[in-house]
Amino acid sequence: MTGSMIVNNLAGLMMLTSLFVISVKSYRLSCGFYACQSLVLVSIFATLSCLFAAEQLLIWSASAFITKVLLVPLIMTYAARNIPQNIPEKALFGPAMMALLAALIVLLCAFVVQPVKLPMATGLKPALAVALGHFLLGLLCIVSQRNILRQIFGYCLMENGSHLVLALLAWRAPELVEIGIATDAIFAVIVMVLLARKIWRTHGTLDVNNLTALKG
């Protein structure tokens, strides 16, 4: 198996884990699947670094391991503490429909990325299609889920997808760019988690349908 095939397969595994993040009922399981997905992303960065002798991506992989594999799951686990796991959740789409939509999104993205010239290798276009699809799947999660914590997970999925797109298209970007992206993502998750916890303590619900009357 060539290096490009390994990267493409790992990218496909990222899409699969994202469906588990969205679909499982337990918040802690979602955190676990997100950590696994982020570990796959770190593996992709490390593989690309070895294939193309890109020291920047090795630094990216170390940064992503600290922020995405360790910090974000810990923050999301904190957000879910003391929140019952058996609260009925409403969503526009069930797990089966989300899987079908994910497949359609990746198929559409495969056509979109055809004209794109990758600076690394043309054999990585499937990974680029999955990365773009991963971003859109995170956006779909935000739109379709009615639970605030699920929407935060959707943001995290979007961030992972955009991170992989950046690695494939602009992998020579300075390390400061990667540090800035990771820092922004961490602070965004922290702010959203604090707001979600405040809403839960005040109103006893995380369903956005019940929060339409909130005033600033």
From Swiss-Prot:
It is a multi-pass membrane protein. The chain crosses the membrane at residues 4-24, 39-59, 60-80, 93-113, 123-143, 151-171, 176-196. It is an enzyme of class 1 (oxidoreductase). Disulfide bonds: none annotated. Keywords: Cell inner membrane, Cell membrane, Membrane, Oxidoreductase, Transmembrane, Transmembrane helix. GO terms for molecular function: oxidoreductase activity. Possible component of hydrogenase 4. PANTHER family: HYDROGENASE-4 COMPONENT E. This is Hydrogenase-4 component E. It comes from Escherichia coli (strain K12).
